[in-house]
C-alpha cells in the first residue's frame, strides 16, 4: 500500500501546521512536494511519525512520544523490513549486515531502546525508513548513544511523557554541501545518501488541568563525524535548528509557549530540572 499523505505547505514564520494530528505535541511541520511522504506507525496507539523524502530515500525527521511504558527489556529483534505505508521502490533494502563494508551502521531515528517495552512497536523501529547511515565508532556507539540513553532516562525518572524529534540534514539552509553515498551491501546497486548532520530535539511540558501551561525544549546538533566529548556540549536553540533545516518544530504548542521555549539554547541541567 502506498500512502502519500497530505503534507502541508511549510510557512515561516507562523502559519505552520502539524503534519498529521493537532493533539500530538511531538509533530513538526511538513514541506510541500510530491517526493515527501508522512507516515505514522501504530501499535494500538501511535508509535512514531516519519517525514520521508522518497527522492533521497531518507527520513528527514522522525517524531515520537516517549514514556516509561514504551521501554522495557525485550531482546533486540533480527532483520529489517519495509515500511508497509510507503511504496517499496522508495525504500532502501537494508539487512542486519548493511554498511558492514564501510564505517557506517544503521542509525535508528526512533531508537530500539525507546520502544523495547512493546514487541510490535519495537519491530516497527526496524522498518528501513527508520534508519540512515551513521558513523559507528565514536558517534552512533558513543555520543549519540549516550544522548539517547539520557533522553530515555528523563522519561523514566520523571515518570512523564516527553516528545522527541530526531532528524538529519544534508546541508543547512543556504549552504551547499557535497553529498556522499554508500550502498547497503557490496552486491547492491542502490546508492544511499549519507547525511552530513544529525539533530535531536526534546520537549517537556507542564499542565494546568488538561491545558499545557509551560514548556521547555532542548536541541542538539551534530556534524556527521567522530566525537570524544559529551552531548551536553552540543546544545543549540530550537530556533537555530529551524533556521538550518527549514522545518518548524513542536507546532502544536500554544504559540506563546513555543516562542519562549524555542528561542534560547537550554542547558542539560536546566532542562532536566524543569
Model-found features: residue ranges?
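Domain-level detector for secreted/extracellular nuclease and nuclease-toxin modules, and
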Residues: 1-274
Amino acid at each position: 500500500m502506498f500512502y502519500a499523505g497530505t503534507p502541508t505547505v511549510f510557512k515561516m514564520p507562523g502559519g505552520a501546521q502539524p503534519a498529521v494530528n493537532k493533539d500530538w505535541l511531538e509533530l513538526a511541520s511538513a514541506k510541500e512536494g510530491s517526493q515527501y511522504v508522512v507516515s505514522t506507525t501504530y501499535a494500538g496507539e501511535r508509535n512514531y511519525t516519519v517525514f520521508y523524502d522518497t527522492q533521497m530515500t531518507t527520513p528527514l525527521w522522525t517524531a515520537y512520544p516517549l514514556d516509561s511504558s514504551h521501554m522495557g527489556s525485550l531482546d533486540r529483534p533480527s532483520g529489517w523490513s519495509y515500511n508497509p505505508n510507503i511504496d517499496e521502490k522508495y525504500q532502501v533494502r537494508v539487512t542486519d549486515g548493511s554498511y558492514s563494508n564501510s564505517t557506517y551502521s544503521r542509525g535508528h531515528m526512533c531508537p530500539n531502546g525507546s520502544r523495547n517495552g512493546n514487541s510490535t512497536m519495537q519491530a516497527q523501529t526496524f522498518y528501513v525508513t527508520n534508519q540512515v547511515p551513521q558513523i559507528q565508532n565514536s558517534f552512533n556507539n558513543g555520543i549519540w548513544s549516550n544522548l539517547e540513553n539520557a533522553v530515555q532516562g528523563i522519561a523514566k525518572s520523571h515518570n512523564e511523557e516527553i516528545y522527541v524529534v530526531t532528524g538529519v540534514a544534508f546541508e543547512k539552509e543556504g549552504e551547499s554541501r557535497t553529498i556522499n553515498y554508500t550502498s547497503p551491501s557490496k552486491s547492491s546497486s542502490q546508492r544511499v545518501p549519507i547525511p552530513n548532520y544529525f539533530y535531536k530535539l526534546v520537549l517537556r511540558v507542564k499542565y494546568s488541568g488538561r491545558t499545557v501551561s509551560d514548556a521547555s525544549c532542548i536541541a542538539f546538533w551534530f556534524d556527521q563525524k567522530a566525537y570524544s566529548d559529551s552531548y551536553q556540549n552540543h546544545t543549540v536553540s530550537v530556533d537555530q535548528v529551524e533556521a538550518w533545516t527549514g522545518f518548524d518544530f513542536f507546532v502544536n504548542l500554544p504559540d506563546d509557549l513555543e516562542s519562549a521555549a524555542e528561542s534560547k539554547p537550554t542547558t542539560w541541567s536546566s532542562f532536566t530540572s524543569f
